[in-house]
From Swiss-Prot:
Superkingdom to which the source organism belongs: Viruses
Protein known as: Putative tail protein
UniProt xrefs under InterPro entries: Phage_69_Orf23_MTP, Phgtail_TP901_1
Pfam families, per database record: Phage_tail_2 (PF06199)
Underlying gene: orf53
Lineage: Viruses, Duplodnaviria, Heunggongvirae, Uroviricota, Caudoviricetes
Length: 193
């Protein structure tokens, strides 16, 4: 059986162009998409019609939940209004590089602008936002390093996809890092449920 890709292993990072800082991971992303659309023109001739080429438009899009202190959501909203150039990475965290890229992961690299920020809120719900990011030119394939802050956040969740093989069994630190519900026995009165 094929080893299917798990969407949770795809990590989306952004960085404002020109800043010498680690890229920021989008948190609480619930949906992600990447589309490429070719705008081709057809020209009719006496020998039939043919495509004259055209341009390709690439767009990243997604939906993320918001949380108190979510500065990144504000940053994306400002980037749409202020037309700020951003770098972006789509990293496949389960596909490590080889040889000189052994500490990195398969990735796509983009440069472009955030074109849409839409806040969505409903009664008794969790706020979320949708974004669209328009890619300048063609994306590049390569391998990317996950910033230390990102790897710490991923490890702190204690939960990631594990394969069925013994080589990827849940053991050691991964096992003890999984958050578990706990009851503080000092606050429970006997007979109480």
């Amino acid at each position: 059986m094929a080893n299917m890709k798990n969407s949770n292993d795809r990590i989306i990072l952004f960085r404002k162009a020109g800043e010498k800082v680690d890229a920021t991971k989008m948190l609480f992303l619930t949906e992600y998409g990447l589309s490429h659309e070719a705008d081709t023109d057809t020209e009719d001739t006496m020998d039939g019609s043919y495509n004259t080429g055209g341009s390709v438009e690439s767009t990243m899009s997604g939906t993320a939940k918001m949380f108190y202190g979510d500065d990144f959501a504000d940053e994306i909203e400002d980037a749409v209004v202020d037309r700020v150039l951003y770098e972006a990475w789509e990293v496949e965290s389960r596909i490590p590089g080889k040889n000189g890229d052994a500490t990195k992961f398969k990735a796509k690299y983009f440069q472009g602008f955030h074109n849409k920020f839409e806040l969505k809120a409903e009664a008794n719900g969790i706020d979320e936002y949708e974004y669209e990011y328009g890619v300048n030119g063609r994306f590049q394939r390569g391998f990317a390093t996950l910033p230390e802050a990102v790897t710490k956040k991923l490890k702190a969740t204690g939960y990631r996809f594990h394969d069925t093989t013994k080589a990827d069994a849940l053991t050691g630190e991964d096992l003890t890092a999984i958050p578990q519900p706990k009851v503080d026995s000092s606050t429970v009165t006997p007979g109480e449920v």
